[in-house]
């Protein structure tokens, strides 16, 4: 879908849950829709980093895995917008306003896409793991050393070492604990930054927690990790343990990347400022989900759904001033 000047009503940048709900709502408004996603599939962070994680704070789902939520969001999007165009493995690097008021989106490979309105639903932006300064661990990346849990069954019956003290590390430890043979969690301090409820679950689990411990090195046979040496950072005393997998859960660093050069008003170099309509400071460009900011903003999947519905409705009014910003309820629309 590159090289043509086919014009879309709205283009969403990012196909996470917020973006997918935006596709659904754009379909409800009869908008010709395109989605550009830097990853090879829909789902954003949930699909790339936490597909096996259970989510508890989405209305209507007491408990749902991230993978299943993404599947449900895509199914919903397809139900209202089956003709939406998805473009994968493309990162939007440039956003240009053309003389006729429409937008040209240029990707990192030079593809050009055209749209009347743009909604940025890119989550936390581009992200990559915070790698620890340990050469032995880097040598075994993908060979037993992981930065996320994307395939839970591979940890079944395994001896797992998890490193970190934030939400990522604690979540990973709790995810693999029911199926792993043994789980050890080490943290360089005695204070954890994870959510209070997660820490309660950790305390009640069979995870071996060792504070003031860090990774010295990992060893293996060249094909897969076999051992890990950890040390007490107060005494320097080393302990070598047998491991089958090492999960480095030290979080991810995110960046807005080239979006910082688009002329958008940015909060703390991390989020795009929007008003109550989801509008940025550039007319016709909106933002929703974790990537947007306004006073009182709460970064939740649930709030992203409401934000993108607001953005889509106002984008519709922007490209078609004669249409209503609020079209009525979905039950009325779908039953016509």
Swiss-Prot record:
The keyword NADP applies. FAD binds at residues 18, 37, 45, 50, 92, 127, 290, 331. Transmembrane segments: none annotated. InterPro entries: FAD/NAD-bd_sf, FAD/NAD-binding_dom, Fd--NADP_Rdtase_type_2, Ferredoxin-NADP_redctase_2. It holds the Pfam family Pyr_redox_2. Its cofactor is FAD. PANTHER family: THIOREDOXIN REDUCTASE 1-RELATED-RELATED. This is Ferredoxin--NADP reductase. It comes from Symbiobacterium thermophilum (strain DSM 24528 / JCM 14929 / IAM 14863 / T). The lineage of its organism: Bacteria, Bacillati, Bacillota, Clostridia, Eubacteriales.
């Amino acid at each position: 879908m590159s090289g043509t000047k086919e014009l879309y009503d709205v283009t969403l940048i990012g196909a996470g849950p917020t973006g997918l709900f935006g596709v659904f709502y754009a379909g409800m408004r009869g908008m010709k829709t395109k989605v550009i996603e830097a990853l090879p599939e829909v789902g954003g962070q949930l699909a790339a980093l936490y597909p096996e994680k259970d989510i508890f704070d989405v209305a209507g789902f007491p408990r749902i895995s991230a993978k299943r939520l993404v599947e449900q969001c895509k199914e919903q999007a397809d139900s209202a917008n089956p003709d939406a165009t998805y473009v994968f493995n493309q990162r939007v690097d440039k956003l240009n306003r053309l003389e006729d008021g429409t937008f040209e989106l240029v990707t990192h490979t030079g593809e050009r896409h055209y749209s009347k309105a743009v909604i940025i639903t890119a989550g936390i932006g581009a992200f990559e793991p915070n790698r620890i300064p340990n050469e032995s661990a880097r040598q075994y990346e993908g060979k037993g050393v992981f930065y996320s849990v994307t395939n839970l069954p591979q940890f079944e019956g395994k001896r797992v070492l998890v490193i970190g003290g934030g939400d990522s590390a604690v979540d990973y430890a709790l995810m693999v604990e029911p199926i792993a043979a043994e789980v050890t969690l080490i943290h360089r301090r005695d204070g954890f930054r994870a959510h209070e409820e997660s820490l309660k679950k950790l305390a009640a689990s069979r995870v071996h927690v060792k504070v003031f411990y860090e990774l010295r090195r990992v060893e293996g046979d060249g094909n897969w990790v076999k051992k890990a040496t950890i040390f007490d950072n107060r005494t320097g005393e080393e302990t070598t343990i047998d491991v089958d997998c090492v999960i480095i859960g030290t979080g991810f660093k995110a960046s807005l990347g080239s979006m910082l050069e688009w002329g958008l008003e940015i909060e703390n170099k991390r989020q795009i400022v929007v008003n109550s309509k989801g509008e940025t400071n550039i007319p016709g460009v909106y933002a929703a989900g974790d990537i947007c900011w306004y006073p009182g903003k709460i970064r939740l999947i649930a709030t992203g759904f409401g934000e993108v519905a607001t953005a889509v409705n106002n984008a519709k009014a922007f490209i078609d001033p004669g249409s209503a910003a609020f079209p009525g309820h979905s039950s009325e629309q779908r039953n016509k």
